[in-house]
């Protein structure tokens, strides 16, 4: 008959998967914290601690034992299952209790409270005597059951053994924290000094830019003043030209209507805006040239009617 160990193999696979998950969780946590690490070293440390906690807490043996019981029942050996049926009244309740017990065992093992300390604390309790420095050691029900089952031995050759408890070297921990603090302080100072230099350079560039802007503004002001002077000079020149033309017009032997028309055109010149004044001068010149052209045509027609000829010299 083929022997089935599928449940036991599944339990072992779950334990191994839990270890791999612990390694992945540890390495990913170190990566998120930005801590450099050696994967082999992390793997070895996690494996050592994981094996210690699983073995010392009894979780591994508990899971494997239950898996073996199930495999035996599947193989037709119901003795273990029948023996455990008396206390397995409710599988869900028992599973929840086992889960809670396993969590407590793992938590105690991770805190350095090994199996020896847990058994001793479960077997004995201490009762203080009021008013005295001594105390009474009391045996618990578990100790009584162990005595009845013959699980208690007396070691006549007592050898004091040092209990293996994880201790914390606070001095080295403080030195590590101090080194980390100094390293962080050094990085912060470097960043601050770099920021100060950068801010100083930006300030210098800003001052230089302000100086350039001030120089450009001064140059713009000079050009504006020069432009205003040119505009005033042009306005003055335009006014003097208009006055000179008006004076010259009055000295001419022209009819009053012609003088009045020319004066109106001169008075329409915009003396405040040189650009408009030039346009007005252009219009007046065009009108004068047009009048001269019409006058020449009239004179030419008159000569032809009188049978005269004309020449340009």
UniProtKB/Swiss-Prot annotation:
Region Interaction with host EIF4G1: start-end pairs: 208-313
Region (Interaction with host ZC3H7B): 170-234
GO biological process: regulation of translation
Record-linked InterPro entries: NSP3_N_rotavirus, NSP3_sf, Rotavirus_NSP3
Keywords: Coiled coil, Host cytoplasm, Host-virus interaction, RNA-binding, Translation regulation
Region annotated Dimerization, chain positions: 150-206
Protein's UniProt keywords contain Plastid: no
Gene Ontology molecular functions: RNA binding
Stretches the record annotates as RNA-binding: 1-149
GO cellular component terms given for this protein: host cell cytoplasm
Localization of this protein: Host cytoplasm
Top-level taxon of origin: Viruses
CDD domains: NSP3_rotavirus
Coiled-coil region(s): 166-237
Described function: Plays an important role in stimulating the translation of viral mRNAs. These mRNAs are capped but not polyadenylated, instead terminating in a conserved sequence 'GACC' at the 3' that is recognized by NSP3, which competes with host PABPC1 for EIF4G1 binding. The interaction between NSP3 and host EIF4G1 stabilizes the EIF4E-EIF4G1 interaction, thereby facilitating the initiation of capped mRNA translation.
Subunit architecture: Homodimer. Interacts (via the coiled-coil region) with host ZC3H7B (via LD motif). Interacts with host EIF4G1.
UniProt similarity note: Belongs to the rotavirus NSP3 family.
Protein name: Non-structural protein 3
The species this protein was found in: Rotavirus A (strain RVA/Monkey/United States/RRV/1975/G3P5B[3])
Lineage summary: Viruses, Riboviria, Orthornavirae, Duplornaviricota, Resentoviricetes
């Amino acid at each position: 008959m083929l022997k089935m160990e599928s449940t036991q193999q599944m339990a072992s696979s779950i334990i191994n998967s839990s270890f791999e998950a612990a390694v992945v969780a540890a390495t990913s946590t170190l990566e998120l914290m930005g801590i450099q690490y050696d994967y082999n070293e992390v793997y070895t440390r996690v494996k050592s601690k994981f094996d210690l906690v699983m073995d010392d807490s009894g979780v591994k043996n508990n899971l494997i034992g239950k898996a073996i019981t199930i495999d035996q029942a599947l193989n037709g050996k119901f003795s273990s299952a029948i023996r455990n049926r008396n206390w397995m009244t409710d599988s869900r309740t028992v599973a929840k209790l086992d889960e809670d017990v396993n969590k407590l065992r793992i938590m105690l093992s991770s805190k350095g409270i090994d199996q020896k300390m847990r058994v001793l604390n479960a077997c004995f309790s201490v009762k203080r005597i009021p008013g005295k420095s001594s105390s009474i050691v009391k045996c618990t029900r578990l100790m009584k059951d162990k005595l009845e089952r013959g699980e208690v031995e007396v070691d006549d050759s007592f050898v004091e053994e040092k209990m293996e408890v994880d201790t914390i070297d606070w001095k080295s921990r403080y030195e590590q924290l101090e080194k980390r603090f100094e390293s962080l302080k050094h990085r912060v100072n470097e960043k601050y000094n770099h920021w100060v230099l950068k801010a100083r350079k930006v300030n210098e560039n800003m001052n230089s830019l302000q100086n350039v802007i001030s120089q450009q503004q001064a140059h713009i002001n000079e050009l504006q003043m020069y432009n205003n002077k040119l505009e005033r000079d042009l306005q003055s020149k335009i006014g003097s030209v208009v006055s000179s033309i008006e004076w010259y017009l009055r000295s001419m032997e022209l009819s009053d209507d012609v003088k009045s028309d020319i004066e109106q055109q001169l008075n329409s010149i915009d003396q405040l805006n040189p650009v408009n004044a030039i346009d007005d001068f252009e219009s007046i010149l065009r009108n004068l040239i047009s009048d001269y052209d019409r006058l020449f045509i009239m004179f030419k027609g008159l000569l032809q009617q009188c049978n005269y000829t004309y020449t340009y010299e």
